[in-house]
Amino acid sequence: MASPSCLWLLAVALLPWTCAARALHHLDPPAPLPLVIWHGMGDSCCNPLSMGAIKKMVEKKIPGIYVLSLEIGKTLMEDVENSFFLNVNSQVTTVCQTLAKDPKLQQGYNAMGFSQGGQFLRAVAQRCPSPPMINLISVGGQHQGVFGLPRCPGESSHICDFIRKTLNAGAYSKVVQERLVQAEYWHDPIKEDVYRNHSIFLADINQERGINESYKKNLMALKKFVMVKFLNDSIVDPVDSEWFGFYRSGQAKETIPLQETSLYTQDRLGLKEMDNAGQLVFLATEGDHLQLSEEWFYAHIIPFLG
């Protein structure tokens, strides 16, 4: 039989292990990865009927999550106006600075962009790898641009009337490129050379003028790149752009999928390699532009955020 002194020594020896086991048992589960949201044209960060509702839906399903809905400007009205008239490259630079300063994002974050916010957040992923973006979810984003005039119902309709006239007059003029957001992802398939040489945003992030290896490396670092396409979209033209497809070069009638584009076959962004590795996710839903049901959102989007 062991002596009392031996038992005492054994208890002392086991004490650290017992304390460690108790500490591990009481550790809180890891916090969910933060989420950064970028709204679309004519919207704002905190509209209770759009981004505000999305934020609440995410918080409902993922308790404790930190959600940053980006506000581009000092007021909600300025945020809306900037979605039409503030140079996209300037917006991306500002967002990169905001994310870099946010202590809650430094270990990584997921990103979800709505409509034009989808391609804007892709620019963030390509240009600003720190803090790291883990998953990018593009909801109706136009990654090959648009070649159709925007339709804006309601209060923004007069702005879109102005945009139509301006794009028709000269989408690739320097003054229009610098001051009109929608011109910066205007992609004319009939004038590919003009687009390639004068688009100050989309042609750059799609590697149309040359290969920036850091863009490719940074995009390929994503765990998942999710693209949501709206099958009855009446705003985005062509709708295939939501899955990185576009018009076949030289005309504006026949569209081709991503896999048939030169961007993919030449693998200028690493999309072919990502596709083969299962990093690209293509989702489709019925409905018009950005018309999502809660049930569909919970079933198909939340799994990439939890």
Swiss-Prot record:
PTM comment text: Glycosylated.
Signal peptide: 1-27
Catalytic residues of the enzyme: 115, 233, 289
GO CC terms, sorted: axon; cytosol; extracellular region; Golgi apparatus; lysosome; membrane raft; nucleus; synaptic vesicle
Organism annotation: Macaca fascicularis
Function: Has thioesterase activity against fatty acid thioesters with 14 -18 carbons, including palmitoyl-CoA, S-palmitoyl-N-acetylcysteamine, and palmitoylated proteins. In contrast to PPT2, PPT1 can hydrolyze palmitoylated proteins and palmitoylcysteine.
This protein's UniProt keywords: Disulfide bond, Endoplasmic reticulum, Glycoprotein, Golgi apparatus, Hydrolase, Lysosome, Secreted, Signal
Oligomeric and partner information: Interacts with CLN5, ATP5F1A and ATP5F1B.
Protein name as catalogued: Palmitoyl-protein thioesterase 1
Disulfide bridges in this chain: 45-46, 96-128, 152-160
Entry's family note: Belongs to the palmitoyl-protein thioesterase family.
Enzyme Commission designation: 3.1.2.2, 3.1.2.22
Reactions that this protein is recorded to catalyse: S-hexadecanoyl-L-cysteinyl-[protein] + H2O = L-cysteinyl-[protein] + hexadecanoate + H(+); hexadecanoyl-CoA + H2O = hexadecanoate + CoA + H(+); S-hexadecanoyl-N-acetylcysteamine + H2O = N-acetylcysteamine + hexadecanoate + H(+); S-hexadecanoyl-N-acetylcysteine methyl ester + H2O = N-acetylcysteine methyl ester + hexadecanoate + H(+)
Glycosylation sites: 197, 212, 232
Origin superkingdom: Eukaryota
Localization of this protein: Lysosome; Secreted; Golgi apparatus; Endoplasmic reticulum
SUPFAM superfamilies given in the database record: alpha/beta-Hydrolases (SSF53474)
Any single biological process term in GO: positive regulation of pinocytosis
MF terms (GO), sorted A to Z: long-chain fatty acyl-CoA hydrolase activity; palmitoyl-(protein) hydrolase activity; sulfatide binding
Main location: other
